[in-house]
Amino acid sequence: MNYTLAGAYDSNIALLLTVGDSREAAYEQMAEVLRATRLRGRDLQTNLAFHYGLVHWFLGRTVNARPTTQFIVPYLTAVGELAQEAGQVDVDVAWRLLCSARVDAEVHDKASMRATLAAKESLLLRPIKQLMSSPHLLSGWLSLNKAAFQFEEGHFSSAENPIEVLSDTYHFLRLDWSESLPAANMIWDHDQHILTEAEDFYAELGRRYGCEDWLAIQNLFESGAPESTSDEEWASIIAAHRGFQAGTEILELLPSMARFTGFYDLAVNPDMTISFPERLLDTAYQKAMSKCLAPPPVAKSDEILAASGGMFYGRESPEAPLYVEPGHHFEAGDPLYIVEVMKMFNKVLAPFAGTIEEVLVEGDGVIISKGQQLFKVTPDEKVEVLSEAEISAARSKHTAELVKLFI
């Protein structure tokens, strides 16, 4: 069946139900169902990612938390902070800075280190970019991997094997290897080869030397060659370990962003109630972050675009006058039109003050789409737009500050 959704809602998601032997098992089942669920369509917007991130927020803390109806808006505000932060970070700049630092630190063979990092670039950056493009997925990943990183003396480091974290990330994003899927929907073959080799290497390391966790692996390499291993073989093992770990520090960019925004400040108290940071309860701040989480369509300074699809009404009722007409001056917060979605009538307010030059939608009950031009206007104040070069410079500067937390 082909149909159009006029908002971020779909009953196919709302009616999902899972069961388990425990509350946590039921949550884990729900996380897996949401992970495997795919809805396809033209201009499709649903709340699937929101639910996926929210379920992992509880799994990463405790499924026994007792949130009230007050919880969702502060939670969405925290996710909005992640969205804002993601827009201020350039992953490619972070990667170049990390690679430069690692090559400079290499004593024996800089060329090999440079080649190793180049071979792993897409393996490491592709999932990070996908997470940063979806703040709800990023929220879920940060919740799931809170214990995978530790912050000591102003610096991040791994508390779990980064290779395992990376493998789990591909699964989290449903990018597992498959011979039947298009390349866009799975890990690429050359990246899969590197990741599989790394997983096999650490599995063999565990079998041979009894390394059950990341701490044991670190202790193994710090203590020197085991008696059962020749110096030549041990040198080869060390080289393989260094190669597989090279560049994985880029994963620490994500918890660095979480630390910068205070993502983990929204927490569960010992009595299972929710602890709210004051900033997440501020109404004006909540509205600002909601725009970061669901940004309105990009418009020129002399136009107003439809924030969502639906049915357009230019007046309160059939007998009422139009909200605005050509030549009408409006203030920020004045109603401009009403959009109806699934029998819900939402009044859309002016984001700034200005004068209507032209109304581009004729009549009431007209179906509009998100991003459609509705009004030509002359704003009271000219909006200063930053150039691409200025935006790029600001992102690079902020990214460099974050990179200092893990290099």
Describe the role of every protein-language-model region:
Residues 1-292, 365-366, 370-373, 379-407:
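Catalytic cores of soluble metabolic enzymes centered on carboxylation/carboxyl-transfer
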Residues 8, 15-17, 303-305, 338, ...:
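Structured core elements
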Residues 272-335, 347, 353, 404-405:
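Acidic, low-complexity mobile loops and tails
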Residues 317, 361-364:
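Short, conserved beta-turn/loop elements at beta-strand boundaries and strand-helix junctions
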